[in-house]
């Protein structure tokens, strides 16, 4: 070991002078190289590798150090716990592997061989972060190693100076200021449709996984506490704290140890650190279970509840943000604390205009105040009405009382009474809102209980049972074991609250699934198939029938559950696959088709009496000698289908007043009926004075536009906005045209609209018209599917639909000579050009000259029952004529409805 005495002073001075000169020469060479190649960058010796957008280029005078590796390679084992690591990275301390062909390739641990002074010593492999070389502490260096140590310091200073000049040249990743990780926020709403049953199953599964993980962690903690060895204590003391990126909501918490540990132990430590870290401990309030107001762009302040990331099934929220479950729809969002307010700020956050306009907002307010009143112990007595149809008013009254209580400051307990109980602060606890009964759908279920002690009511425990357990799978298993009757369960969702039989298959159906079936049974996508499953009116993956004349779909979940495991995969492999409605067999596992399903389906829609009304007034037939010509008021007349049918039936028409705004429709009516129609323009401009002047009327007919009512339209505005409001114009003029009291002359009316409308809109229309609709599908009397609702007081509207000899029931009967139909019936023809295409493969319905072809306009007119060339006026294009037909009525259906009028009015 060389001495460090005074005798070596002169030699040391000479060596330092040589080192200084050598360093200056290298610095000049480096400056020349940088001026010649400004894009080349020097790589630091001993710096742990990290990913960059541009790979660094090593300079010629920089020795290759075996300790310099990529991010995935371990650091030198000599590095102590004080060495800096890239933020959020976990580097295992193990022996580095030298590169093949390097001078140190044969040395263990990368140590340089004797006599090789150009190699970087192990001390040079210390961690360098942000341009600073961090030296080790607690290690003594002998005087004999002074030269190597000084040389290393000089090299580090050179590299530091070079980095100072090139700051930012390597991109954001190499500069002092790091580019923040993008924050991924989850706004309200899911990227795809998720049924309520599927979401509940996911929540239950996440809960079970969370509880299982918590048990494993508890066992691991108990085992670690029993192992009180000194080595484990050293490991725990030497472990640096876990670091988490504050800008990344999904960055995991990692734990590091100074020495390599076994794989199992590493997994234990990582799992424990990730799961045991408390949530929302940033000192900014809003803990788990608290009721809050949250603000998202485009929405009013919306009530929600702070929940754990476990419940969302996604990643942890970043510091300063919270996971919020919104009341009303039960969806999740990450919201920063600056956009949150406590529920006690009800006066400033509650928005009365949104409450009056949006049913979902009313539902959310109801649910959050139910929870708040339960926590505060505030009792709001439920209103009990003898008529179940008035339960919507009871809900409104109760909601109004709760809002007044909230606006008054949640007295007497105040904001203190809104704090969550201890059991709701558990991050693994799932929260479910009380059942909401919409005012327009209140007759479907009784109003919810007002406070917790009333859990003995019949409705709430059943809802809890459906939510908390995979009831459908369990009940189907019991049916297979002959322990339960399938008619006693809802085969659509698994509910035990069966109110009627499923119209297509053996099994029951609950009220909620009935509402879904009424909305979705006749809702079709652009490919002509049903939008949702025939059984459950849901499903994300559906199997489409291969029969060209069938348009039904079945979801994979229902098929595997009711038919048998693996049945869906077998159906996918079968090509073409005939569904369970058009297959030859009637029984497929537990799925048994009803033999009388056509009549049951018709009665399902015809007897859909959610509201009971007085039967319409029945007029006795008028003696033949006293019959007079009919006077008609036609609103939204279209192409005068009503007048055409009356003429076909031979009924004399005295006056036909029509309200229409489409110029093409008016042209068709004027030309085809020789000016016998009196057009009066926009329906909104017709007043009561006009009705008295043009009347009296014997028949009022109309069908308002369905664009904003059909649930097929994702941008629909409903009954009270857009074109949906035109229904109230029909109601207004119908009221003005009714005979006055004491006038017993026969008076009839008819209103038509689409079947695929929301249940609430249908109920509102029925409430105003004081009549329940009948559903009639034109496929029974024509070559096209066209299901429509009809409200009215025409005699015999509920009678079976029967075709006549002149009705063209097959598409082939409607085609011109030389053209072959590929389908027996076509899907509903709308104003859109692609509605002509049929099937999942979007085939044209006609085959001509060995090619597929569309329907000609004359053929579409035959499909609707119009005379040939009925719309061929004023050089209208094919698409314009299709738009007129797509908005019109089916002539055979209107003939079926108008036929009884021959007993009341004069005929030719």
UniProtKB/Swiss-Prot annotation:
List the SUPFAM superfamilies hit by this protein, alphabetically.
Answer: S-adenosyl-L-methionine-dependent methyltransferases, Tudor/PWWP/MBT
Phosphoserine sites (modified residues): 102, 239, 251, 386, 389
Substitution effect: residue 752 to A: Reduces activity about 10-fold
Protein's name in the database: DNA (cytosine-5)-methyltransferase 3A
Q: Which gene produces this protein?
A: Dnmt3a
Residues of crosslink Glycyl lysine isopeptide (Lys-Gly) (interchain with G-Cter in SUMO2)? Answer: 158
EC class, as a word, reads transferase
Give the residues the record marks as binding S-adenosyl-L-methionine: 637-641, 660, 682-684, 887-889
Polar residues composition bias: residue spans? 69-80, 242-256
Q: Which UniProt keywords apply?
A: Chromatin regulator, Chromosome, Cytoplasm, DNA-binding, Isopeptide bond, Metal-binding, Methylation, Methyltransferase, Nucleus, Phosphoprotein, Repressor, S-adenosyl-L-methionine, Transcription, Transcription regulation, Transferase, Ubl conjugation, Zinc, Zinc-finger
Tell me what the record says results from residue 706 to A: Reduces activity about 5-fold. Reduces DNA-binding capacity. Abolished cysteine-methylation
Chain positions with Phosphothreonine modification? 120, 257
What functional role does this protein have? Required for genome-wide de novo methylation and is essential for the establishment of DNA methylation patterns during development. DNA methylation is coordinated with methylation of histones. It modifies DNA in a non-processive manner and also methylates non-CpG sites. May preferentially methylate DNA linker between 2 nucleosomal cores and is inhibited by histone H1. Plays a role in paternal and maternal imprinting. Required for methylation of most imprinted loci in germ cells. Acts as a transcriptional corepressor for ZBTB18.
Basic residues bias locations:
44-54
